Amino acid sequence: MQGTLSVWLAKRGLVHRSLGFDYQGIETLQIKPEDWDSIAVILYVYGYNYLRSQCAYDVAPGGLLASVYHLTRIEYGVNQAEEVCIKVFTHRSNPRIPSVFWVWKSTDFQERESYDMLGITYDSHPRLKRILMPESWIGWPLRKDYIAPNFYEIQDAY
């Protein structure tokens, strides 16, 4: 079942895939990485000018990585806000997604956190560097296939 935004995008020939609705009834769309920067600008101009959150996750060990954007459009008042969830999947071998920092400035720290924890490179991000882990940290700690270097359990310390 397609939502109103999916229908609107399809009428304009914008490539996307509807993933249905989440448990709150929020429409979820999949956008290809190569289309994300242009569709982000279109969504902003259409009224989705508030980025509620951006996060990322590891879909499966050895599988894809996903960057998730929750956008809000407030046209008829706060009580009638329209929300959409955008998912951009990328291969873990070369995880690159265009940064939307230039569209929504609030993605600054959020894209940096996704880079720091999962290794997704956000192209054209002005300050893409580690934000939580030290610069010397090796690897991406939230990937499902991550093996912590020199890791031991607390019980092994005694």
Curated annotation (Swiss-Prot):
The lineage of its organism: Eukaryota, Viridiplantae, Streptophyta, Embryophyta, Tracheophyta. NDH is composed of at least 16 different subunits, 5 of which are encoded in the nucleus. This is NAD(P)H-quinone oxidoreductase subunit J, chloroplastic. It is found in: Plastid, Chloroplast thylakoid membrane. One of its GO terms (molecular function) is quinone binding. GO terms for biological process: photosynthesis, light reaction. NDH shuttles electrons from NAD(P)H:plastoquinone, via FMN and iron-sulfur (Fe-S) centers, to quinones in the photosynthetic chain and possibly in a chloroplast respiratory chain. The immediate electron acceptor for the enzyme in this species is believed to be plastoquinone. Couples the redox reaction to proton translocation, and thus conserves the redox energy in a proton gradient. It is a peripheral membrane protein. Keywords: Chloroplast, Membrane, NAD, NADP, Plastid, Plastoquinone, Quinone, Thylakoid, Translocase, Transport. It comes from Barbarea verna. It catalyses: a plastoquinone + NADH + (n+1) H(+)(in) = a plastoquinol + NAD(+) + n H(+)(out); a plastoquinone + NADPH + (n+1) H(+)(in) = a plastoquinol + NADP(+) + n H(+)(out). Disulfide bonds: none annotated. GO terms for cellular component: chloroplast thylakoid membrane.
